[in-house]
């Protein structure tokens, strides 16, 4: 029997080590059991990677993180090559251990008080016009990291007054009142929180999260700021059905959410949850049509769509798939 892992502060636990810490266990996927990727899931890498390396260098120089790298996003090359990135604040170690996610789990260190300033300067240097700020879950902080979000928003706007800011926030479990009080005083231009999947599979996919809590977070922010778009995203391919996805879309509309993203789940490693199915582009088109019929102002639905994929285009209502 292997010894239980004793977490050390500041150490990243990934793959088998991370999964060993999850109460709901996953079965390691053997290579022969992996679903073959269909043709529509093949990615063509850009010929010129100089812009990609430039953005990575800027991140390293300022001690910043991107969710693009930490979560092994399949769109990293495309987004970096276009000069866009989703910044991940509050460190690169998450207090949650979701078995679909490639972000490291562990005991995070104290938030960097200089991060808002460094982030704002980096964004100004890159001359970005639209930026997405997300974070790991920080259940170790009394406000879940809400004040750090607010500090980052203020610092960015001070350096780049015309920029549009989208925040992709955690669920602030047990801290919603405190977090919303802070965020309501310094709101973003788009407020995003992902449901990730359907309630039936939450115990397996999002241990530690609560479907109704996440809906309430989105609803309460919208009630306080009816003029600000609220947004949420889901992955498909984790055992849900299309009918269940449509029902979640209805729940989102009932809670005031106006923007939607749907994308294909991809297994980061054989230790993570396996892909149960690949949803075809035609099915994504059908779900987008259903979303628009429900009254979403924008729905980005496609195999490679992620919550922050071409977020600037999503905010403008342009086609993204």
Curated annotation (Swiss-Prot):
Recorded hits in Pfam families, A to Z, give: LIAS_N, Radical_SAM
Can you give the residue ranges of the Radical SAM core domain? 80-297
- Residues annotated as binding [4Fe-4S] cluster 2 are 94, 98, 101
Keyword Iron-sulfur on entry:
yes
Subcellular localization:
Cytoplasm
This enzyme catalyses: [[Fe-S] cluster scaffold protein carrying a second [4Fe-4S](2+) cluster] + N(6)-octanoyl-L-lysyl-[protein] + 2 oxidized [2Fe-2S]-[ferredoxin] + 2 S-adenosyl-L-methionine + 4 H(+) = [[Fe-S] cluster scaffold protein] + N(6)-[(R)-dihydrolipoyl]-L-lysyl-[protein] + 4 Fe(3+) + 2 hydrogen sulfide + 2 5'-deoxyadenosine + 2 L-methionine + 2 reduced [2Fe-2S]-[ferredoxin]
Keyword line: 4Fe-4S, Cytoplasm, Iron, Iron-sulfur, Metal-binding, S-adenosyl-L-methionine, Transferase
Gene3D superfamilies registered for this protein in UniProt = Aldolase class I (3.20.20.70)
GO MF, one annotated term: lipoate synthase activity
- At the top of the EC hierarchy, this enzyme's class is transferase
Q: Which GO terms describe its cellular component?
A: cytoplasm
Give, as in the UniProt entry, the pathway in which the protein acts. Answer: Protein modification; protein lipoylation via endogenous pathway; protein N(6)-(lipoyl)lysine from octanoyl-[acyl-carrier-protein]: step 2/2
Cofactors demanded by this protein: [4Fe-4S] cluster
The answer to whether UniProt assigns keyword Glycosyltransferase to this entry is: no
**Cofactor descriptive note:** Binds 2 [4Fe-4S] clusters per subunit. One cluster is coordinated with 3 cysteines and an exchangeable S-adenosyl-L-methionine.
Which E.C. number(s) belong to this protein? Answer: 2.8.1.8
Q: Which family does it belong to?
A: Belongs to the radical SAM superfamily. Lipoyl synthase family.
Q: Which HAMAP family match?
A: Lipoyl_synth
Q: Which NCBIfam families match?
A: lipA, PRK05481.1, PRK12928.1
Q: Which PANTHER family match?
A: LIPOYL SYNTHASE, LIPOYL SYNTHASE, MITOCHONDRIAL
- Name used for this protein in its record: Lipoyl synthase
Lineage here is: Bacteria, Pseudomonadati, Pseudomonadota, Gammaproteobacteria, Enterobacterales
